[in-house]
Amino acid sequence: RSKQTLKHTFEQIGLIKNNNKVHFFSETHERYAKISLELFLENKFLGVGPKGFKKECVKKYNIEKCNTHPHNIFFQVISELGLLGIIMYIVLISLIIFKFFQCLAKEDSKFLIYLSLFIFLNPFFPSGSLFNNWLLIIHFVSLPYLYVKKYN
């Protein structure tokens, strides 16, 4: 009975369809990920440009498949910013993880800020657009605080 309940729950949230195929969050998220990878392969070095996902997606596919962004920070970075963006993204994520553990070891409360930055930039979960002003303000308003804490 518990297996059926678990399967039903996964079907409800779109992780498994009746054909028992497991999806990356949902069929739609999986489709956006595939489109992002295709756009990346066509524009490896610089990507299609910030906020270019929808424009390029509409050119390549029908409008029903396209959204303003791929709903995942990692896929947005590779499709819109290319290799240059992904290198900066990996460096930034690595720095955030390093600083998080450094602050955690020192019992410094700044680890919470690094944790929130990692959650925002997390490559494993669906997300809003990286170039959405509201999301950027919410998540990066803490950066001046880190600067002040470091030098005071």
Q: Across the structure, where does each feature detected by a protein language model lie?
A:
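Short active-site segment of divalent metal-dependent hydrolases/proteases
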Residues: 74, 85, 130
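Long extracytoplasmic/lumenal interhelical loops at the membrane interface
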Residues: 14-81
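Generic hydrophobic alpha-helical membrane-span motif
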Residues: 53-55, 77, 88-91, 133
